[in-house]
Regions:
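Short S/T/G/P-rich N-terminal loop/turn motif that feeds into the first structured element of a domain
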Residues: 1-95
Length: 95
């Protein structure tokens, strides 16, 4: 399992969340996404950060290479290609 931290530039937050929670969720599940959590950054309107949990790097790459995913991102109002940072868990610690 891997985690991915994404920075996404988008036009309208409600449009983005609407597509992300429906067509986007379907596409992510198809390609092995286990969960996603969306964050806003104070003072950065037009941008969200997303933390994904994915079954494997290969599954995530399959997601990125799917032409339907690109179309879904465009319909969400995503501007350009999101920036993805792949994270490897080092430790789970309490508190």
């Amino acid at each position: 399992m891997i985690h991915i931290w994404a920075t996404v530039e988008m036009g309208d937050l409600q449009q983005f969340i609407g597509v992300f929670a429906t067509a986007g969720a379907k596409a992510r599940r198809k390609h092995g996404s286990r969960s996603s959590r969306v964050f806003t950054v104070p003072g950065h309107t037009g941008q969200v950060r997303v933390l994904f949990e994915w079954e494997s790097r290969e599954a995530f790459e399959g997601f990125l290479n799917d032409p339907e995913v690109r179309a879904t991102m465009q319909s969400s109002g995503t501007v350009g290609r999101p920036d993805f940072l792949i994270l490897d868990a080092l430790a789970d610690l309490p508190g």
